From Swiss-Prot:
Function statement: Inhibits post-transcriptional processing of cellular pre-mRNA, by binding and inhibiting two cellular proteins that are required for the 3'-end processing of cellular pre-mRNAs: the 30 kDa cleavage and polyadenylation specificity factor/CPSF4 and the poly(A)-binding protein 2/PABPN1. In turn, unprocessed 3' end pre-mRNAs accumulate in the host nucleus and are no longer exported to the cytoplasm. Cellular protein synthesis is thereby shut off very early after virus infection.
Short sequence motif named Nuclear localization signal, residue ranges: 34-38
Region of interest called RNA-binding and homodimerization, as start-end residue ranges on this chain: 1-73
InterPro entries listed in its UniProt record: NS1, NS1A, NS1A_effect_dom-like_sf, uS15_NS1_RNA-bd_sf
GO cellular component: a single term: host cell cytoplasm
Disordered: annotated segments: 205-237
Species annotation: Influenza A virus (strain A/Swine/Colorado/1/1977 H3N2)
Biological processes, Gene Ontology terms: symbiont-mediated suppression of host cytoplasmic pattern recognition receptor signaling pathway via inhibition of RIG-I activity; symbiont-mediated suppression of host gene expression; symbiont-mediated suppression of host mRNA processing; symbiont-mediated suppression of host PKR/eIFalpha signaling; symbiont-mediated suppression of host type I interferon-mediated signaling pathway
Start and end residues of each stretch annotated as PABPN1-binding: 223-230
Motif residue range(s): Nuclear export signal: 137-146
Protein name: Non-structural protein 1
Gene Ontology MF, one: protein serine/threonine kinase inhibitor activity
Subunit structure: Homodimer. Interacts with host TRIM25 (via coiled coil); this interaction specifically inhibits TRIM25 multimerization and TRIM25-mediated RIGI CARD ubiquitination. Interacts with human EIF2AK2/PKR, CPSF4, IVNS1ABP and PABPN1.
């Protein structure tokens, strides 16, 4: 096992513990709390994958951080903070939309790289809007927190979320997953639009009809998803 992978996990565990103390003292806002909950799931998955105990890793992570802070000068810290751009948290969804439980009449789940796509195949002939909460850096999507598909009535009919056991994803991973989700929804004659905020930070542009400017590769992925469903339906008949 790579030592950097282990030390990164240990430091992440300790930093999560510090952030938890901030929340316990009621000093964190809603986005801070949301990231804390999702990072907890991610750490549990990573710990299981690496075979490491989170409590023990937290103690080692504390030692690593204390050693770095002891050697770090205030001047170096100021220079680092000044040269590192800060990420922003973008919220398409309200706290209620983000935390609401939902269920599927005809569930389908697909793993696309480090992301999990869930869709209710019972939904037909609906106008659907994709909205997401995510972080942004350099005016580009950095990390997807959660994406959900909503009908005009407000029902949740689809979702894209990071896999807790597979930390890290790229903007291309997110766009590919969105392409698969759109393909699955459009197969049932639904009309799918993407929020302007998500279009702007994922694709760098917005489309008036709400459709994302998918690349040829993403369109081929949508087509493959649709064709595989056609074959399964024929076999079922």
């Amino acid at each position: 096992m790579d030592s950097n992978t282990v030390s990164s996990f240990q430091v992440d565990c300790f930093l999560w513990h510090v952030r938890k103390q901030i929340v316990d003292q009621e000093l964190g806002d809603a986005p801070f709390l949301d990231r804390l909950r999702r990072d907890q799931k991610s750490l549990r998955g990573r710990g299981s994958t690496l075979g490491l105990d989170i409590e023990a890793a937290t103690h080692v992570g504390k030692q690593i951080v204390e050693k770095i802070l002891k050697e770090e000068s205030d001047e170096a810290l100021t220079m680092t903070m000044a040269s590192t751009p800060a990420s922003r948290y973008i919220t398409d969804m309200t706290t209620e939309e983000l935390s609401r439980d939902w269920f599927m009449l005809m569930p389908k789940q697909k793993v696309e790289g480090p992301l999990c796509i869930r869709i209710d195949q019972a939904i037909m002939n609906k106008n659907i809007m994709l909205k997401a909460n995510f972080s942004v850096i350099f005016d580009r999507l950095e990390t997807l927190i959660l994406l959900r598909a909503f009908t005009e009535e407000g029902a949740i009919v689809g979702e894209i979320s990071p896999l807790p056991s597979f930390p890290g994803h790229t903007i291309e991973d997110v766009k590919n997953a969105i392409g698969v989700l759109i393909g699955g929804l459009e197969w049932n004659d639904n009309t799918v639009r993407v929020s302007k905020t998500l279009q702007r930070f994922a694709w760098g542009s917005s489309n008036e009809n709400g459709g994302p400017p998918l690349t040829p590769k993403q369109k081929r992925k949508m087509a493959r998803t649709t064709r595989s469903k056609v074959r399964r339906d024929k076999m079922a008949d």
